[in-house]
Amino acid sequence: LPVESNSIDVAAQNCLFNIFTAEDLHQALKEMYRVLKPHGRLVLSDPICDMDMPEALKNDERLRALCLSGAIPLNDYIDMITSVGFGTVEIRAKRPYRILSPKHYPGAQENIIIESVEVCAIKDPMPQDGPCVFTGKSAIYFGEYELFDDRQGHTLLQNQPLAICDKTAHNLKALQNENIYISESSFFYDGGGCC
């Protein structure tokens, strides 16, 4: 892009990255990372799917024009975003979008569920233990004390939900503390959490 490095606060795209090949998507994400200021945000909205797209559908130009053939699994999508350096990824929303059924798409061996995902990738420094990915998980402490401190920077107040990243959810769950509830991913996140 003919844009200076570290010069943009927010960049956004809607369904554009889904029409790229994996190599082109990686290059586009690298460029977005380059032009964003530190703590700048890349807001994305793309179709994703829960499985690898069959080659016959991946190479279908009609589906590419519909922004469907480039859909990849959410974890792969997040990995592509974090592989260029984004230290924080927030899944803001995820909802059903389309179904590619074998009846209508002969290249599909089974129904392929396509979902629309809204993501905010933040140009934060990459934590030593990997990126902070927020998928809408929360932790609630309901023990006998006023709070629970995991000594890793997370303080859970008595009976107050706290938005946490998936990495923190995993670490809290590993404590096997029967007084801490960890929710499943809601795939809705509007900020205010900790990693």
Which residues are covered by each model-predicted region?
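Short, glycine-/aromatic-enriched active-site segment of Class I SAM-dependent methyltransferases
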Residues: P47-L68
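Short alpha-helix
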Residues: S69-I91
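C-terminal lobe and adjacent flexible extensions of AdoMet/dcAdoMet transferase-like proteins
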Residues: V84-P96, L100-C195
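A short SAM/SAH-binding and catalytic strip from SAM-dependent methyltransferases
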Residues: D9-D24
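Short "lid" loop at the C-terminus of a central beta-strand within the Rossmann-like core
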Residues: L16-F17, P47-M51, A93-R98
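A short glycine-rich, Lys/Arg-flanked "PGG" loop and its adjoining helix->strand segment in the class I
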Residues: H26-R41
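Class I S-adenosylmethionine-dependent transferase superfamily signal
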Residues: C15, E31-Y33, I81
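A short acidic, Gly/Pro-enriched loop at the edge of an enzyme's catalytic core
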Residues: L1-A11
